[in-house]
Every structure is written in C-alpha cells, then in structure tokens.
Design a protein with these regions (language model features):
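Electrostatic, structured charged patches in enzyme active sites and in nucleic-acid/phosphate-binding
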Residues: 1-209
C-alpha cells in the first residue's frame, strides 16, 4: 500500500505533466506573439575579473562563471570570432527573465529553465546550453532539454516574421565535443549542428511519471 506522501508525490507528478502537455499543445496559429528584446535590459552587472569585452553582443562586457567558467569563456570567445555568427547573447536569468522554458524536475514539480546562450546566424537562431560531458545523462538536464525542444517546435510553427525569419534550434554543447571540434577549426554552426544531432535525444526512461 502506498504511503500518503508517496501518493501525493504521484498526483503532483501527474498534474505537472498534464499542465505542461496542455501548454505544449496550444494551437500556435491562434497565438498572440508578445515580443521582448534583450536591448530592453540596458546593462548587466559584471565582475571585472570574470568578464569579456566582445564584439557581437549588445553588452559592453559579458560575465562568465568565476567557478569552473573556463568552458563558457572559451565558447564565448570562439562564437565572437566566427564570421557566420551575426550576434549572440549570454542569458542572465535575473535580468533576462523572459527567456525561460518550463520543465518537470525529478520531484515532479514544474520549474523554469534559463538556457545559457542565444546565437543568431543569417537565417537560424540557436538556443544553446553549455554542459560538462559528464552531466549529459543527468535527469534535470534531459528534462530541461525536453521542455526547450517543445518550445522550439512551437516557435517554428509561427509565421516567419514572428520568429525573426529564422529556423530555431536547441542544442546542448558539451565541453568534450567543443574542444575536439575547436581543435579541428570547425565553425560554430558546424559544432551546433553536430551537438543538435548527437545530444538531442530525449529517452523516455528519464520521464516515467
């Protein structure tokens, strides 16, 4: 017999799934698109010792994590130097609170996920999460991925001028793949396409509610 606490947990998980499924199945053709822009946030606080002056982002300086932030720093520098990249932004979840997706965490609760970057090329937008290779099979990483992919699929059903006349993508760039491809002088777009193909599977084994 299930304990009361276990039963409540099951109900919460099922309700969370129903709510997320309902939102994912909204008819996009009838959607009212509210556009918000990164430029609405005029500036971001940064720590001087852990920030970069970059060309292709709207902010004078962009911060990277002080603790184990080397991968993000290297990724930003590589993106900034790539001729196919028109612009990109490092998402700050406190200031860019309009860039988030819902997902169901391991406890069955609905949470908001803020990805790391948005990268714009001529006719594509990439929502990018940078992640250590060892974390790719983490439950929450895969739950966030599922939520982001649902969002991207809905975005791509909108009229072209409501999605920046671009096809939208979501991909997780892991550190091992990034450094391997960087060593081969791969373009940022090639890296993103490769990671989208290899890291975007969402196995149902993670989501047995």
């Amino acid at each position: 017999m299930l304990k009361k606490q276990d039963l409540i947990g099951i109900i919460v998980k099922q309700m969370s799934k129903v709510i997320c499924d309902m939102q994912s199945n909204v008819d996009v053709e009838e959607a009212v698109v509210k556009k918000e822009y990164f430029s609405q946030v005029a500036s971001l606080p940064v720590r001087e010792n852990y920030s970069l002056e970059l060309v292709k982002t709207i902010y004078t300086k962009t911060q990277y994590p002080s603790n184990r932030g080397g991968f993000e720093k290297d990724f930003m520098m590589y993106v900034d130097a790539d001729c196919e990249v028109e612009r990109f932004v490092k998402i700050n979840e406190r200031r860019h609170n309009f860039v988030n997706f819902q997902y169901i965490n391991e406890n069955g609760l609905i949470r908001h996920y803020f990805p790391d970057f948005m990268v714009k090329t001529a006719d594509e937008v990439y929502i990018v999460e940078t992640k250590a290779c060892r974390d790719l099979n983490n439950y929450d990483v895969n739950a966030k991925k599922k939520g982001a992919l649902n969002y991207v699929n809905r975005i791509n059903k909108l009229k072209a001028d409501d999605r920046m006349n671009s096809v939208w993508h979501y991909c997780i760039v892991d550190d091992r793949t990034f450094y391997e491809k960087q060593e081969l002088s791969a373009s940022v777009k090639d890296i993103l396409i490769y990671c989208e193909l290899t890291n975007n599977n969402t196995s149902d084994e993670f989501f047995n509610y």
